[in-house]
Amino acid sequence: MTPESLLASASINIGLAVVALWLFSVLKKQPRNAVVYYARRLSDRHHHRPLSLHSSLCLPRFLPSVAWIPRAFRVPEDEILSRHGLDALVLIRLFKFGIRFFLMCSLLGASLLLPVDYYNESDLPTRREYSMDAFTISNITRGSNKLWVHFSCLWCISFYALFLLHKEYKEILVIRLQQMKELRHRADQFTVLVRQVPLCPEHNTRGCAVDHFFSKHHRFSYHSHQMLYDGRDLEYLLGKQKKLKKELEDKRHTEILSNGSQEHKQISTSEEKLREITHMIYHLQSETMLREKELPVAFVTFKSRRNAALAAQTQQHSNPLELITEMAPEPRDVSWRNLAIPQKILPLNKIGVILAAALLTIFFAIPVTAVQGIAKYEKLKKWFPPAMAIEFIPGLSSVVTGYLPSAILKGFMYIIPFAMLGLAYLGGSISNSKEEIKACNMVFYFLMGNVFFLSLISGSLLDEIGEYLTHPRDIPSHLAAAVSAQAEFFMTYILTDGLSGFSLEILQLGLILFDIIRSYTYGRGKERTPYLFSFPYFRVIPTVSLSIMIGMIYAVVAPLMLPFLVGYFCLGYIVYFNQMEDVYETTYDTCGRFWPFIHHYIFVSIILMQITMVGLFGLKSKPSAAIATVPLILITIAYNEYCKIRFLPSFKHFPIQTAVEIDEEDEKNGEMETHYVDAATAYNRHQPCLERVSSAESPTNLSQPLLGTDSI
């Protein structure tokens, strides 16, 4: 890739970003767009916060502004934590980690690495003229002592990354434990999820077995339980009932306006259908029918957090395949349909998910290889001679090779997070948060394999496969060379993902167009509701982590990329802070359980950076530097093992010490009984089939709580 191609990519991405941000700053002032740009603040839970919209046709309403940008840097972390939860704060701190790390690397690169790379005694003028290699480690001659500068920078960057990681892990853990104390009213702190519940031999019901077991073995701490039921039939009928009630309201409204006999007849028919469905629901919700639909799953509530944590983290039954316990997710986080999946089928589901993810990865190797073919224009002309026609249009070849490959790749990659989230759902996770965490893992490794490694192989090594087969020992050296050769492509990828990607994220162009089409077609005359969606951690975290990985690997190899990454993380911080404040809803809070996975992604990035440098030092005939880098790899691995021992268990489990401290605080304030009694009924309000419909009720007011905590 030539400097002209890189300049074309930067110009296009900067232009798109400026236009998108300009449009956003104007469109968000228009009252009709509030359902898109202020969806969270318009929702019922956050409607108390006023909106500053221009209702009159005044000039400021149509002028762009940047007032929303400094807002992101003014809000303290404590306020983010109280408004959005610790998961949102973890994402914000991920962007801050990127800013701090790459800012230091940029200063180091500008002061040491760039001068050393550029002013080399054996620079090749032709390479400096036609490529960016003059600013990379590729410009250093074999065996040069200048490589010790790169070696020193590698150690410095690695230790700084480990220092930041340790600092973040420690601080987030402290905030997590404090947040658990602040959220002591949450039902999941008192509740244990029990799976594989056996049948009671006396009464032939599972609810009875749960009650007998915990009453006997947790006599003084057990409070109550709630069985789960196969409510697919009930959910279907409840949905049908809701639809009929809405239709009935519309027909009554029409009758008032028209005062016709035809409308009165239709209303009578709808009321009769509604009564029939109500009786069917009432029948299915009888205790006899519910017992027949019992699932081997129960939520068991304890009288203290300490006893709940002990029960969740210990083996209950002599047969480890029965009465399997774990801390329950919070009620709004439960994946109700996955709880109905039998435990013995879950391993098959997981194998199927792994196979599907592998097939998806292989399938996407085709477009990635094609994209790299476009990026290498000289090779593209050999493979596809008609491509030479673009040379007749001035500047077009720079656009095609500089901007188009990264834009196409980003377009293909957009659908991957949603596909992986669907696969994670099929894996049978008990909560939505665990589904998102699994999706994060799959998306990150998919991006690492397809976007990074496959881009290296298909872009730099495709024409040397035969040589690899004949000389397999040279593969590490060739891979190290490939990393250096692909610096320009990944620079354009960072530009596209950051400038264009973040700008289009905040613009929400697709949703704006959909809202306009809906308003003038099937949604005409209907009330417009906010487009409120859950925050897409599964999409944001892996993408940002991939950019950290690319930046780390190229921190010593191509320091010219580092300032672009500082801009990438600054823009990402501003954009996603705005989305948290105004657009996306926080539907659950895991109290920071995303961080250990983010830590792992960054650890993998550091290891890849160090291994790449070992290969590059070998390629540059500096074996002493390569050997001296091996202890750094071992230190990094040892540090990661330390973090697994020191921090990770407190994210996986509910520490007994913390549970006791919260219990003591509750007992001191006289709130313990209130909290565990509320916890006993919290899950009833979220399971669809636990809503009773009485046959004596009015057809338009048909729901009330179904059962108590012991539904047996």
UniProtKB/Swiss-Prot annotation:
It holds the Pfam family PHM7_cyt. The chain crosses the membrane at residues 6-26, 94-114, 146-166, 351-371, 407-427, 442-462, 494-514, 546-566, 597-617, 623-643. This is Hyperosmolality-gated Ca2+ permeable channel 2.5. Keywords: Calcium, Ion channel, Ion transport, Membrane, Transmembrane, Transmembrane helix, Transport. Belongs to the CSC1 (TC 1.A.17) family. Its main location: membrane. GO terms for molecular function: calcium-activated cation channel activity. It is a multi-pass membrane protein. The keyword Transmembrane helix applies. It comes from the Eukaryota.
